[in-house]
Amino acid sequence: RQICIRDRAVTSMLALNPLIKNDLIDTDHIVVDSKIGSSGAGAGAGTSHAMRAGVIRPYKPAKHRHTGEIEQELSETAGRKIKVSMSPHAVDVVRGILCTNHTFLKKDVDEKELWKIYRSEYSEERFIRLIRDKDGLHKFPDPKFLVGSNFCDIGFDLDKDNNRLIALSASDNLMKGAAGSAIQNMNVMSGFDEFEGIMYSPLTPV
């Protein structure tokens, strides 16, 4: 089954799927905070530079239409109905999406075990990169470093005081979130090399 899922859905789902598959999180309390550039919206007054520059604008903070896509795919993984709350924000970039996925742990798990779970899930997936730098400016996924590529970067942080696991995921909404995933699916369905035509390095710095 090859499904081409939209930008916010695929970006958040890739971070959440291993956690649900391993029954690590409370599936009744998943909150997705997504931030996306202007290319994620249609043409209109709200996407002009004058209106978009400098903004961090919430829109459709409840019942966004892409919520159903996330719930559909995660429910299939879990084998039961899962509910997700998602609140998107428009930000002052053209391309890129960052999902901060707030989850709550059902069992005690440490950072080492979480990395093992993510590596086990994505070790064969060349378009998924696991990101964590203990020092430096870019400790977590950042869509700036994904523009023009079909990669999705995933990382996480643990809030032990509140039993919270924050799974972070970033992608280029026009590539992994749209055309890149479509071409990748077409390659698989047609028997081509999965990476044909989409194995590009990110366009950073621009």
Set out the residue ranges of the language-model regions:
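Short, small-residue-biased leader/transition segments that mark boundaries at the very start
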Residues: 1-5
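Gly/Ser/Thr-rich loops at beta-strand to alpha-helix junctions
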Residues: 6-10, 38, 174-175
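Alpha-helical support elements that line or immediately flank enzyme active sites
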Residues: 7-24, 32
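Predominant activation on well-ordered alpha-helical scaffold segments within soluble catalytic domains
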Residues: 13-20, 67-71, 115, 119, ...
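Phosphate-handling active-site elements
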Residues: 21-31, 190-199
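C-terminal substrate-binding/catalytic lobe of Rossmann-fold NAD(P)-dependent oxidoreductases
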Residues: 27-33, 38-167
